[in-house]
A protein has these predicted regions:
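SAM-dependent transferase fold signal centered on methyltransferase-like domains
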Residues: 1-140
Length: 140
């Protein structure tokens, strides 16, 4: 994952002012926000979410609406799309599933959305991604 200062922190997006800040900067150029706020918390997390909302709206349509918190960089780029994850989940008939390389958790989320899903185990070794994975799966 990215350098620790570049990681998204879930607690930054739970702050009371986060939604208002994101809404008021929806149309502001990302480069301008980065120049103004740099890597300062909570702004770096908020700017990262704006970037994901703009760049990946078609890849994660319902998760963006569900306030899923996305990591910066490669994990978001390489993850399954929401549509692909739901398709993969539809191929599995077991009531229990395991994802040993969960990444940011899109496939894990899809496994838990299936009818008849009774349990899912998700594992991620990267500490930053693991923190987001736990937060997102608990809150969706």
């Amino acid at each position: 994952m990215a350098h620790p200062k570049h990681q998204v922190h879930p607690e930054d997006l739970e702050r009371p002012e986060a939604k208002d800040w994101l809404a008021s900067h929806q149309d502001t150029a990302l480069k301008d926000l980065r120049l103004k706020f740099g890597l300062k918390r909570p702004y770096a997390s908020w700017i990262a979410q704006l970037e994901v909302q703009r760049k990946y709206a078609n890849k994660f349509p319902s998760l963006l609406l569900a306030n899923w918190i996305f990591p910066t960089g490669q994990a978001t780029e390489q993850s399954s799309s929401e549509r692909t994850a739901l398709y993969k989940a539809s191929l599995i008939s077991s009531q229990f599933t395991v994802d040993l390389c969960a990444g940011m958790g899109i496939d894990s989320w899809a496994f838990t959305q299936r009818d008849g899903s009774l349990g899912h185990f998700a594992n991620e070794l990267d500490p930053g991604l693991s923190k987001l994975l736990k937060f997102n799966l608990k809150n969706t």
